[in-house]
Amino acid sequence: MVPLLPLYALLLLFLCDINPANANSYYDKVLAHSRIRGRDQGPNVCALQQILGTKKKYFSSCKNWYQGAICGKKTTVLYECCPGYMRMEGMKGCPAVMPIDHVYGTLGIVGATTTQHYSDVSKLREEIEGKGSYTYFAPSNEAWENLDSDIRRGLENNVNVELLNALHSHMVNKRMLTKDLKHGMVIPSMYNNLGLFINHYPNGVVTVNCARVIHGNQIATNGVVHVIDRVLTQIGTSIQDFLEAEDDLSSFRAAAITSDLLESLGRDGHFTLFAPTNEAFEKLPRGVLERIMGDKVASEALMKYHILNTLQCSEAITGGAVFETMEGNTIEIGCEGDSISINGIKMVNKKDIVTKNGVIHLIDEVLIPDSAKQVIELAGKQQTTFTDLVAQLGLASSLKPDGEYTLLAPVNNAFSDDTLSMDQRLLKLILQNHILKVKVGLSDLYNGQILETIGGKQLRVFVYRTAICIENSCMVRGSKQGRNGAIHIFREIIQPAEKSLHDKLRQDKRFSIFLSLLEAADLKDLLTQPGDWTLFAPTNDAFKGMTSEERELLIGDKNALQNIILYHLTPGVYIGKGFEPGVTNILKTTQGSKIYLKGVNETLLVNELKSKESDIMTTNGVIHVVDKLLYPADIPVGNDQLLELLNKLIKYIQIKFVRGSTFKEIPMTVYTTKIITKVVEPKIKVIQGSLQPIIKTEGPAMTKIQIEGDPDFRLIKEGETVTEVIHGEPVIKKYTKIIDGVPVEITEKQTREERIITGPEIKYTRISTGGGETGETLQKFLQKEVSKVTKFIEGGDGHLFEDEEIKRLLQGDTPAKKIPANKRVQGPRRRSREGRSQ
């Protein structure tokens, strides 16, 4: 008896090794979960889920157990003995181990009696009862019943050859447990070494040539039996062979040839092909199909979008899953009962056509990837209002197939009734603000980026921790890139900024008190110059009850006033909807203290105060409206009267009082813009006329260059003003100017001057003079250079023609009278008595 102990120990070790709970394969992990769910029913009981109305059963995964459904269908829970165990009369659960027999006997133990019978009549029985080690993928009785009757009859009529070969094609010449069946493995069968494609999926499903293992790991003395849900058919063709032989796939075959992909489907691999039928192609608009087929890049993208680089059998799909296609984008494959859906649409009409390099599913819809679509075709159901308006107002036709564009598409509910009912010309301008001249993908956007629309407007990009915004509107998920452009989805209609912070406040009477205090604090320039600011602007309600004496008190302490006002201003542009909802965002104000912002239920809270209106865009920042005066809680007040005033206006916090304390003086930093002016010496060209020559002077040309980059900061003391000074050294050389045929010598003069630029931008002019019968020549010249016409007055300054003057010149009016060099005359010009034009 002693020698039996080591043998018994080895047997226990073997059984422990194959115990699903101790294995690491997906199948065994799901089996272990089913065992846990069934343990209340007794030892070695597994919980299975059966889809209602079918005979399909699955070991319970965690996900399916809690959902109570598989492929969207409700399931009922069954409790059965786990593989390798059996019940005993009068005892709970499955306390007994199944007897171990040879492979032939095990077929009967697992209930695969039809396979057992066919193994007997085909003379396979002797082989699987004898010596050896086999893996038998045995079709269930139901699988044989579902086999095509003609095929089954043919096997039964030739049991010694056809049936025997068919059964051998279900066998492998070694024992392989589910943990040995690796995903993507190809195992040679016992019939001509034809490959068996093994797939072992994360949800625990194991397939062989897309047949699902429904009862695995039935150990035999000379191998193992895995019961499968269908009969395996012999395969010897590739996906390419199948496409070339199927007449119903001729359109798809043509697309494969056009894109040079047909031959690649004949190579070794583990592909999944969703092949659209000819009927599917007939559903496409003819123009769309012709455009794609005429574009090799688009047709290649179309083909690759139908191919996966992994073998995906239908039986492995128990819920929605996302897969990457060869094209690079993803598709979602799901199931609804026995139907397979792609991107949420049931379209698979024939599944699991197994070939030697993959599997084919026939579909009745053509899958068009974004990369093969025109930019306007990228819009989804939530952007139909935008795309409909773009088409109705004639903008869609301007999006040329060979151009590149970016659509900034607001969602449907962003368009109010008032917007939709406005004048179509104005509505067209609004839509133009949502179309960019170039293709800009999501990954191309960065903070501070300037984008130009087809309407000529410039839009700013703001990138935050959890949001990307363009002007006042922030993106939602759904950005796509197509053949000639990209689309990004926005919550609201984008409103380009037109006015500065100061101009916005000035045109809104709600801010008149705050604006007056801001100007009294000498802070007006801060809101007029270029920059990026966020202003929390208090309305007049914030100062309700403040008397004129109290206002004078506040203005009288300039440091205090500046501290209070600058606490409402923070560097950077912060859009309300750009903040991560529900969390506090801490910003440092220009005054130096912190301000606390939070987005709650589409409302911006500023120091826990609700903003009455947010995201008012300006050219140098954004305004958020508050109806309370903001004050930094960490700054004490040392003046009794000021404290009384602040307590009168601010009731939501307790202001500290420290007698004698004063407000700090805040050094004001301003942006300075570098301007370089280049002066080019004038060139004189004499145009001969019939009576009077025309002097055409080009120059002096002045080029204004604005250098953008990091701002320069310098300290500006109180009372000091900032002036932009341009240094130049124009050189005027000696030349002769002919006026009415009389030569006038102008001596060479060289000077150095400083020009203080306080007015509008420098305009470039062209200098000319003439008159008499040379009007036709002058008129032609003016028509070409109508925006650059200047009349040169002898001894005086150049004069820029206004629009009305230009019109009169074009109509033949004569120039004005002579004007002294040291005097500029306003009003209409007249001819002098001498007849000399100026």
Swiss-Prot record:
Gene disruption: observed consequences: Reduced amount of collagen cross-linking in femur and periosteum.
Cellular location(s): Golgi apparatus; Secreted; Secreted, Extracellular space, Extracellular matrix
Pfam (any one): Fasciclin
GO cellular component terms, A-Z: collagen-containing extracellular matrix; extracellular matrix; extracellular space; neuromuscular junction; trans-Golgi network
Listed Basic residues bias regions: 826-838
Keywords: Cell adhesion, Disulfide bond, Extracellular matrix, Gamma-carboxyglutamic acid, Glycoprotein, Golgi apparatus, Heparin-binding, Repeat, Secreted, Signal
Record-annotated EMI domain positions: 42-96
GO biological process: bone regeneration; cell adhesion; cellular response to fibroblast growth factor stimulus; cellular response to transforming growth factor beta stimulus; cellular response to tumor necrosis factor; cellular response to vitamin K; extracellular matrix organization; negative regulation of cell-matrix adhesion
InterPro entries: Adhesion/Biosynth-related, EMI_domain, FAS1_dom_sf, FAS1_domain, TGFBI/POSTN
Free-text tissue specificity from the UniProt record: Preferentially expressed in periosteum and periodontal ligament. Also expressed in the developing and adult heart.
Leader sequence residues: 1-23
PANTHER family (UniProt xref): PERIOSTIN, PERIOSTIN-RELATED
Quaternary context: Homodimer. Interacts with BMP1 and fibronectin.
Name of the protein in question: Periostin
Organism, scientific name: Mus musculus (Mouse)
